[in-house]
Amino acid sequence: MKTKWLISVIILFVFIFPQNLVFAGEDKNEGVKVVRDNFGVPHLYAKNKKDLYEAYGYVMAKDRLFQLEMFRRGNEGTVSEIFGEDYLSKDEQSRRDGYSNKEIKKMIDGLDRQPKELIAKFAEGISRYVNEALKDPDDKLSKEFHEYQFLPQKWTSTDVVRVYMVSMTYFMDNHQELKNAEILAKLEHEYGTEVSRKMFDDLVWKNDPSAPTSIVSEGKPKRDSSSQSLQILSSAVIKASEKVGKERENFVQTSEELGLPLKIGSNAAIVGSEKSATGNALLFSGPQVGFVAPGFLYEVGLHAPGFDMEGSGFIGYPFIMFGANNHFALSATAGYGNVTDIFEEKLNAKNSSQYLYKGKWRDMEKRKESFTVKGDNGEKKTVEKIYYRTVHGPVISRDETNKVAYSKSWSFRGTEAQSMSAYMKANWAKNLKEFENAASEYTMSLNWYYADKKGDIAYYHVGRYPVRNSKIDERIPTPGTGEYEWKGFIPFKENPHVINPKNGYVVNWNNKPSKEWVNGEYSFYWGEDNRVQQYINGMEARGKVTLEDINEINYTASFAQLRANLFKQLLIDVLDKNKSTNGNYIYLIEKLEEWNNLKEDENKDGYYDAGIAAFFDEWWNNLHDKLFMDELGDFYGITKEITDHRYGASLAYKILNKESTNYKWVNVDQEKIIMESTNEVLAKLQSEKGLKAEKWRMPIKTMTFGEKSLIGIPHGYGSMTPIIEMNRGSENHYIEMTPTGPSGFNITPPGQIGFVKKDGTISDHYDDQLVMFAEWKFKPYLFNKKDINKAAKNVSALNMSK
C-alpha cells in the first residue's frame, strides 16, 4: 500500500488547484462566518462562544435535519407516531429506560453555567434552521420529510441532552449477566454443578492475565479460576434471558432501520515524542459505529476568541470527540467497563408490584406512558403502557408465576448531563491538567486519549465504576434483597491511566486497559487472543513511527484475518511435525508463511488476493466446530458468540496451545484435531476448486453505506455503491501536534451533507469521500485559517442577532 503517495497526491490536489469562491447569504463580515471547504465541511468563525455554538447547531441542522429528527424521535420514544406499530416496542424500551423531561431539566439545572448556556445555544441553532425550513419547506426540508409527510420540531436543551444520554447509554448497556446466567443454568441442568462451573469459568473467565493491555506493566495478576462465590438464582432466569434477548433483537433491528447508531467499537493510538519519528506527539482515531449515509459523525471547525478546534462528533452532540484544538489532539474508544448490573428482585406472592428489600416489602414505582401510534390506515391512536421501577432501576422482566423480576442499574444513572458537560470541558481544555479534570467528571465507560504540542501523551479509562460486594460474582445477576448493594464507587485516580508510558505509545481496540482491571459479565471480551494485537504488533515491529506508519498499521488491522494472529503459527507448527507424511503439508506451510494474513484485493479483480485465506477461513470454522460442538451440544448456539467472538477466540487458543483450563474440552490430542480439520478442508477445496491455492481464491465481501432500510427506503436514501468490507473506523483522523498546532489528514465518509432536495437531488458532498475511503485516500486536516481559506469553496455569514 503506497500510503505516502496517496496522501501526498490528495493534499497536492487540494492546495495547488485554485478554488472558485462563492460568497452567499448576508455580509460576510457580520455575524458568524461560515467557510465551507471543498468537501463541504463548515469552519465557523464567531466573536464569542454563544454565537459559535448556535451556529454549530444551525449548520448541523442545515446539513442533517432529517437525521437529527430521527435521532430525537428514536431516543425519546416517538417513532411509532410516524412509522407505525412495528416501532412501538422500540419506543417502549426507550421510555422504560429513559428519563422524563422534568428529570432531564433537573440534571441540566445542576450543570456549570458555561456548558448549560452553550447546550441551550446549540439547541437554539437547530431550532433556528427548523423555523427557516418550516417557512420554506419546498427548498429547506429534505425529501424524507415530504416522503413520510411529517414536520420537524424545534429543539430544546432537553432534546440535546436526551439524544446524548440515551445513545451513549445504549453503548454502555447490556443484558449479558442474564445471558451468562442462562448459560450456567442450562449447563448445570445437563452436567451438574461441579462440571458446569468448570465449563462456565472457562467460557466466561474472571480475569485472563495473558490478555494484551493498553497500559504495559510488569508482572501478572493471579488468574481467577474458580466460581467460589456464585450466588444462587431463580430458575426463572432462563425465561427472563430469552425474553429480554428477543426484545433486544427487536430493538436493534428497528433502530438500525431508523439509522440510529448501535454498533460501538473503535480503535485509537497515541505516540509520544520518544517513539515519534518527528519528535511530535501523534494521534490516530478510528471510531467504529457503523456505515450509513449520511454518516453518524459530523465534521466541523469551531473558532472563537481563545478557542479553536476541528474534528468530528456524533450527530446531535455539541462537542468534538475526534480531533484537536490549539493545544492537543483527543480521541475516544468504548471502554466496556462494568457499569451495568442486573438485580434479581423477589416479588410478594400476594402483590407482584411489591419486592423484598432490606427485610421489607416495597412498592415499585409505577409510571404510565402514552404513545401516539400511526395505524395502517394513517389514523393515529393512543396506546398507554405501565412501567415499573425498583430502587435499582427500571424493571426489564417480571415473572409473576415464579415471583421474580429483574431490574437494571447503571452506575452513571443521573449523571449523564454531567458527562456531556465533561466532554465539552475537554474540548475547551488547554493543557493536560484541565483535560484530566474533565476526564474525572466523566461517568460513562470510555477510553480517552490525549497528545499535545509538548510531545506528551496520556490515556484514561474514564467512568464511574461501582465497588461491589465481595460475596457476589459479577458475571451474573445480583440478588436485589438489599444485602449485596454497591458500597460506593472506585475513585477516579484508581481507574487505569498512564501519562507518557515507557514504551512511548498507547494503542486500544476496546481491549483490556490494565492487567488488574476486570469487566465482569463481559470478561470474555478481554482474553489472550485479542484483535488489539494487530496494533501492538505493528508498533513493536517499527522503531520510531510517523502518521504514515500508523496508517499502514491501521490498513493491516482493517483487512486482517484476526484468527491468523495466533492460530496460523499453531497450524504451521503442527503441519511441520507431519510434513514427512504428506507433500501437501509442505505446500500449505509455504503458502501460509507467504501470506500476510490479510484479506485484501489490491488488483481490484473482485477476489481476495491470497487463495490460502480461503483455506484458513474454512479450516478455522471446521476446527472451532470440532472443539466445541460435541461438548456443548444443544448449548453450542448460545455460547458460540463467546467461543468465536469478534474480538478473539481465547478459550480455543488455550485448548489448542495446551494451556491450563478448568474443564477438559477434548479427549484426543489437540494436534490430531488440527490435522483432521486440515485434511477435511484441504480435500474439499482441492476436489471442488483445484489442487493449488490460486484456484481457491474467494470473491470479496462488500459493504455499502446505508443498506439498512427505513420502511423500505434506504436511510437518508443511502449510498449503495459497494466497496470491499473493512474492519475499519467509520472515520479516521491522523493528527501530528507540531509546535505551531495540529496537522495531518482525515476522512469522514461517505460525505458531509445529508440533505436531499425535494426532487431527489443530492449535494455534491453527499458521498464524495466514499471512493476515497475505499481507496485509502485522505483529505488534509484543515485547522489554521490560511489553509482553510486556500481550500474554501463557499463563504457565508449567519447573523445570530436576528
UniProtKB/Swiss-Prot annotation:
Its main location: secreted. It comes from the Bacteria. The active site is at 266 (nucleophile). GO terms for cellular component: extracellular region. GO terms for biological process: antibiotic biosynthetic process; response to antibiotic. Binds 1 Ca(2+) ion per subunit. Changing residue 224 to E: In strain: CA4098. GO terms for molecular function: metal ion binding; penicillin amidase activity. It is an enzyme of class 3 (hydrolase). Changing residue 740 to K: In strain: CA4098. It is found in: Secreted. Ca(2+) binds at residues 177, 341. It catalyses: a penicillin + H2O = 6-aminopenicillanate + a carboxylate. Residues 1-24 form the signal peptide. This is Penicillin G acylase. It comes from Priestia megaterium (Bacillus megaterium).
